[in-house]
Amino acid sequence: MSLENKNIIITAGGTGGHIYPALAIAELLRQNKANVTWVGTPNSMEASIVPEYFNIQFIKSSGVRRKGIIKKITFPLKLAYNTLRSRSLLKKLKADLVIGFGGYVSGPICLAAALINIPVIIHEQNAKIGLTNRILAKFATTICLAFEIENLHKQFSSKQLAKTKLVGNPVRKDIVALNDKARIYTDSSTLKILVLGGSQGAKAINEIIPKLIRKSNEQGINIKVWHQTGKLSLEETKDAYKDISQNHIKDIAAFIDDMATAYNWADLVICRAGALTVSECAIAGLPAIFIPLPSAVDDHQFFNAQNIVNNNAGFCLRQQQMTLENLLAIIKPLNQDRSKLEQMSKMAKKTLIKNSSEQILDCVKKILNNK
């Protein structure tokens, strides 16, 4: 089925974990000749990223979690107001279908679509269903999941389960291309570690890595790092590396623009367990030490990592467990026997769900074909 002249609304915002999978789908829809419009919130991450690629419209929207009593009381009124505004926007755009990728902005847009009988697809990137998507699941035409959800039958009705599809997380093409490339782990004297703290950086990870390099050196383990610090921690982290030889440093940067090159360079990654990072590690076949963000809602980062960990393709340390001793206990055996890394790489690739973007595209076509 052709999507030519179909008006499809993408709504996602707040974090890269919501935005980048949505961008992958938006691009695929455009390649299939759909008219794609993004709806986000002003003064947000999507407001700075999306306009380079797609037309974007804005509505104001905010969440209610962990907010004061006044905001909780006024939230229903704001939601109703934003839903009415969203309804007007969808009519103006002559929307044929809405796809929600999470973030607070998805709530009013998807609710408004359901109220005026516009089909809605929601996509949950994490292994725990977020509050917005739990609410929207009642109204969605199709519910797409990135991970197997523990006890899903206790969270969804039989009707909701019937419209649920496991599709994985859409990932950028340059990273998908790494899946076809076998990782060869030689007995090189250098262990190349990519360090990622997520888009906001991770202070605890940034602080321990320079110490890890020094301690590893004492034990005869030659580590070289490519370290993404996040914008707020760049200078502080660079200072911590001052007495470390440049032979141990590939680069220290606030952000890494070319993640495919970074994943391809590394033997191992130390990172948070955001949904997109976990999915990219699986696709790239990159063994990982995951340090879930302690403050993540519903501890979702811990659960994101479990599929890879349970398949012996990675490790997971709680932040309080992220000591030099525990990190070295993982790294030392991998450095001594590189075949373990090679086996982990193969197992990581087995955990992924392939063709995620194409599966979501198929959902779009089926819904519009039956409309």
UniProtKB/Swiss-Prot annotation:
<dbReference type="GO" id="GO:0009252">
    <property type="term" value="P:peptidoglycan biosynthetic process"/>
</dbReference>
<dbReference type="GO" id="GO:0071555">
    <property type="term" value="P:cell wall organization"/>
</dbReference>
<comment type="similarity">
    <text>Belongs to the glycosyltransferase 28 family. MurG subfamily.</text>
</comment>
<dbReference type="Pfam" id="PF03033">
    <property type="entry name" value="Glyco_transf_28"/>
</dbReference>
<keyword id="KW-1003">Cell membrane</keyword>
<feature type="binding site">
    <location>
        <begin position="275"/>
        <end position="280"/>
    </location>
    <ligand>
        <name>UDP-N-acetyl-alpha-D-glucosamine</name>
    </ligand>
</feature>
<comment type="pathway">
    <text>Cell wall biogenesis; peptidoglycan biosynthesis.</text>
</comment>
<keyword id="KW-0573">Peptidoglycan synthesis</keyword>
<keyword id="KW-0131">Cell cycle</keyword>
<keyword id="KW-0328">Glycosyltransferase</keyword>
<dbReference type="GO" id="GO:0051991">
    <property type="term" value="F:UDP-N-acetyl-D-glucosamine:N-acetylmuramoyl-L-alanyl-D-glutamyl-meso-2,6-diaminopimelyl-D-alanyl-D-alanine-diphosphoundecaprenol 4-beta-N-acetylglucosaminlytransferase activity"/>
</dbReference>
<keyword id="KW-0961">Cell wall biogenesis/degradation</keyword>
<keyword id="KW-0997">Cell inner membrane</keyword>
<dbReference type="GO" id="GO:0005975">
    <property type="term" value="P:carbohydrate metabolic process"/>
</dbReference>
<dbReference type="GO" id="GO:0051301">
    <property type="term" value="P:cell division"/>
</dbReference>
<feature type="binding site">
    <location>
        <position position="172"/>
    </location>
    <ligand>
        <name>UDP-N-acetyl-alpha-D-glucosamine</name>
    </ligand>
</feature>
<dbReference type="GO" id="GO:0008360">
    <property type="term" value="P:regulation of cell shape"/>
</dbReference>
<keyword id="KW-0133">Cell shape</keyword>
<keyword id="KW-0808">Transferase</keyword>
<dbReference type="InterPro" id="IPR006009">
    <property type="entry name" value="GlcNAc_MurG"/>
</dbReference>
<dbReference type="InterPro" id="IPR007235">
    <property type="entry name" value="Glyco_trans_28_C"/>
</dbReference>
<feature type="binding site">
    <location>
        <position position="301"/>
    </location>
    <ligand>
        <name>UDP-N-acetyl-alpha-D-glucosamine</name>
    </ligand>
</feature>
<comment type="function">
    <text>Cell wall formation. Catalyzes the transfer of a GlcNAc subunit on undecaprenyl-pyrophosphoryl-MurNAc-pentapeptide (lipid intermediate I) to form undecaprenyl-pyrophosphoryl-MurNAc-(pentapeptide)GlcNAc (lipid intermediate II).</text>
</comment>
<feature type="binding site">
    <location>
        <begin position="15"/>
        <end position="17"/>
    </location>
    <ligand>
        <name>UDP-N-acetyl-alpha-D-glucosamine</name>
    </ligand>
</feature>
<dbReference type="GO" id="GO:0050511">
    <property type="term" value="F:undecaprenyldiphospho-muramoylpentapeptide beta-N-acetylglucosaminyltransferase activity"/>
</dbReference>
<dbReference type="GO" id="GO:0005886">
    <property type="term" value="C:plasma membrane"/>
</dbReference>
<feature type="binding site">
    <location>
        <position position="199"/>
    </location>
    <ligand>
        <name>UDP-N-acetyl-alpha-D-glucosamine</name>
    </ligand>
</feature>
<dbReference type="InterPro" id="IPR004276">
    <property type="entry name" value="GlycoTrans_28_N"/>
</dbReference>
<dbReference type="GO" id="GO:0030259">
    <property type="term" value="P:lipid glycosylation"/>
</dbReference>
<protein>
    <recommendedName>
        <fullName>UDP-N-acetylglucosamine--N-acetylmuramyl-(pentapeptide) pyrophosphoryl-undecaprenol N-acetylglucosamine transferase</fullName>
        <ecNumber>2.4.1.227</ecNumber>
    </recommendedName>
</protein>
<feature type="binding site">
    <location>
        <position position="256"/>
    </location>
    <ligand>
        <name>UDP-N-acetyl-alpha-D-glucosamine</name>
    </ligand>
</feature>
<feature type="binding site">
    <location>
        <position position="126"/>
    </location>
    <ligand>
        <name>UDP-N-acetyl-alpha-D-glucosamine</name>
    </ligand>
</feature>
<dbReference type="Pfam" id="PF04101">
    <property type="entry name" value="Glyco_tran_28_C"/>
</dbReference>
<keyword id="KW-0472">Membrane</keyword>
<keyword id="KW-0132">Cell division</keyword>
